[in-house]
Structure formats: structure tokens, C-alpha cells
Amino acid sequence: MVSEAPPFWWDKPDWRALSLAPAAWLYGAVAGRRLLKAEPPKISLPVLCVGNFTVGGAGKTPTAIAFSAGAKARGLNPGIVSRGYGGAYKGLHVVDPAHDSARYVGDEPLLLARHASVALCPDRLKAARHLQALGCDFIIMDDGFQSARLFADFSLLVVDAARGIGNGKVIPAGPLRAPLTDQMRKTDALLRIGKGDGADFVIRQTARAGRPIYEARLKPSSTTPIAGNRWLAFAGIGNPEKFYASVAEAGGEIVETCSFPDHHSFASDDIRNLTDTARRQGLGLITTAKDQVRLATMIGVPAGFLTKLAVLNVDLKFDRNDALDHILDTVIERFKSRVTS
């Protein structure tokens, strides 16, 4: 899996995408066949897959958190299955948010573990069974749509409204993990997050395929006042522009930005440079919740840096009040039909 998306993937197709077309065709043929022909193993629990069509950030983490909260509100005990991108564990591991570090389990699982039990394992079936043994009765699969490692009763694909699916090409010519037509055949519904027309093409394709389309937005929040203050905003996530837009939406004035690779492991020089730049210009430092969990578990990060750091959290809010419950109802109904048939 490609961990860092080249910038040209998000622009109109150019000579680079064209030159990589043969490799993209081969990659797409293999990925598409695996997606369509595989028969994923099943578990005797309802499973919701939260995935996306492309490499890069789309909003899966806040979506998984929202469904975890929704399941808990029903009296369920949700568990989240993840591969743990950005971490060092290769076997089965249940994330302990009080003791694990992002270096070993990854930033997203550590953030998710604040909201539900999280099991990491390349074998998602094994992870789901372990969560079942721990008492979980509803599984949320964080990513894994293309892997076919665990059967999902419902697959919700997340797309960023501004970014969409980039140039619409398959890896390595573009960000798609498999041909869109193949992915659409396995998609149960689409969730468009935010504002913008970048996802218009995939929205049209989803509508033509007869799949339901849901709309949501990310509502920013922070324990630190954001509005009216001047910031140096930094992030090491898949789509930092979405974070910068959220800071502006919260009323913050962004004077400087600093973007790092996705899942970036911050070094002492990074922290020193950020601190010096902010001090020279009289700016506050603000980052994402994912970056904060990495920084908080790093060895050698000055305590003063963390206490002065503002963190912008985002909560997923559906445009329709009944949307989340409708999806949960569908997952559970499909599961009941599956186990009784």
C-alpha cells in the first residue's frame, strides 16, 4: 500500500499519470479481481466497514468515532478492527490508550481507542474474533474495504467533498486503490464530507449505481480559544488542507502552515523549528488530534511544548439527523438476515 500520495494525483491527469498508465492497468486488474472475486470470512457479529476509494485522508477516523458513539447510544459494545498503519505491531494487539505509544500502534488506532476497544492485526478476522471474546457485539472495520479479509454487512465509503478521487486514476497513476467501477459494485453507500465540487464525479457514479448518498460535515472544537487568534498550523495527516480549512472555519487566522508526511514521526528539529518560527512571529501553535497523540507519546518532547499546543478536534455531524441510525439499522438487519438464512 502506498503511504504517501504524490501531489499530481490530485490534479487533472498529466504526462506523469499517462506514463504510469500501463502499471496502473496491471495494479487495477489485480486489485479489482481480488475485490470482486474474494469471499471474505464471516464472523457472527454485525460488521460495518468504513472505507474510502483512495489513498489519503478522507475522514474515516471521525466517521468511525461517530458510529462508535452511535452504537454505544443503543446499548451496544462496539469494537474497532484496524491494521494499524504507522505502527510497529505485526501481530494481534489490543490498544491501551493509557500506555501504548503512536510509534508502536499508530496514531489513528490510539485516537480511536479513546472511544472504543481497538484490536490491531493484519488478519482482520482474527482481530474481530478477539474483540468478540472481549465482549464486543458490534464491529467497525476501520479501512479494509479493498482487503477482503473480513466480510462486512455494510460498506460505507467516505469521500472528501473538496478533494474527491483526485485524477480518477489507479495507483501508481492516481490515488484509486482499485478501478472505481469495481469498487462501486461492492459499495453499499457513500458519505460525502464537507463542501466543494471535487467529489461531483464520484457522486454521479454513485447515483447511477443506485447507491444511497449521505452528507456530513466536520465540526471543529477545541479546549483552547481558536477564534481571533493568529496561528502556525501544522499537520502530518493525509489531507492537511482539510485541517487548515477547519481552523479557519473555527475563526482562527492562519499566518503560517507546515505540512508533514502522513503519520509523520516528529523529530527534535521539527519541534525546535516550529517553536522558533511561532515565537518569532508571535503565533500560537495548533495541530490535529492525530498529531497530538503522536507528540504526546514521543520521548523527549518538552513538556512546555505540549502544554502550549492547541489541538483542533473534529466531530462528524450528518446533515440528516436520522442518517447514522438508519445506517446502523441496516447493518444490524443485514446481519440478522445473514445468520438466519
UniProtKB/Swiss-Prot annotation:
Keywords: ATP-binding, Kinase, Lipid A biosynthesis, Lipid biosynthesis, Lipid metabolism, Nucleotide-binding, Transferase. The lineage of its organism: Bacteria, Pseudomonadati, Pseudomonadota, Alphaproteobacteria, Hyphomicrobiales. Pathway: Glycolipid biosynthesis; lipid IV(A) biosynthesis; lipid IV(A) from (3R)-3-hydroxytetradecanoyl-[acyl-carrier-protein] and UDP-N-acetyl-alpha-D-glucosamine: step 6/6. Its EC number is 2.7.1.130. It catalyses: a lipid A disaccharide + ATP = a lipid IVA + ADP + H(+). Belongs to the LpxK family. GO terms for molecular function: ATP binding; tetraacyldisaccharide 4'-kinase activity. One of its GO terms (cellular component) is plasma membrane. The gene is lpxK. HAMAP family: LpxK. This is Tetraacyldisaccharide 4'-kinase. Transfers the gamma-phosphate of ATP to the 4'-position of a tetraacyldisaccharide 1-phosphate intermediate (termed DS-1-P) to form tetraacyldisaccharide 1,4'-bis-phosphate (lipid IVA). It holds the Pfam family LpxK. One of its GO terms (biological process) is lipid A biosynthetic process. ATP binds at T54, V55, G56, G57, A58, G59, K60, T61. PANTHER family: TETRAACYLDISACCHARIDE 4'-KINASE, TETRAACYLDISACCHARIDE 4'-KINASE, MITOCHONDRIAL-RELATED.
